[in-house]
Amino acid sequence: PDHYTCAYDLAIMAAYLIKIGGEDLLNVTSLYDSYIREDTKQSFWLVNTNKLLKLYDGVDGLKTGYTKEAGYCLVTTAKRDDQRIIGVLMNESAPKTRNEEMCNLLDYGFNNYQQITLFKKDSVIEQHLVDKMDNLTIDVKCKKDIVYTKAKSADAKVSTKVNYKENFLPVKQGDVIGTLDVIVDGKTIATYDVYSDTNASKSTYLSKTIKTLKYLF
């Protein structure tokens, strides 16, 4: 009693589950049938109740469900061309109807939305000047693809902004030196860590003084 949720809640939970579970999770949820507990005396053959694994190209999870109050429910995820979509249906009248409606929902997602890659993993986002006197720059990189999803019909204005930590020198290769914001139509929709691809030391007061004198004389 008094235990409620909605499709949006389940979609958020599914996205987080995929994020932390990764391929280990999807390797299990994508199995249509398999022996369970093979190393025990209680091993048995289990057939996945998510029939979309064989009905819809790209489906690799997640969970079916049923209660009298909620009806036939389904949280599904499918991936095509590096774009992953999560669909949630609740209170369907029968498993067949649930499957048909989910196929329609996934079709709508793939037909109307696309994933745009702004920067590929390990690509240089920009070069950042860290010491004007030495003209020292470092390559700024991301450790994952930086992407966003847009409606195919939308003409969105997209930009990125790197926010650097203050006084991050000295820095080693791989250290986080700031964040990159993905901004769509003036609104920040995602934030990623960015890293230095270079070792860089901090100039001492003495070295700066010597360089200044050399510059003057």
Question: Which residues make up each language-model segment?
Answer:
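Domain-terminus/edge residues, biased toward the C-terminal soluble/receptor-binding domains
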Residues: 2-4, 8-217
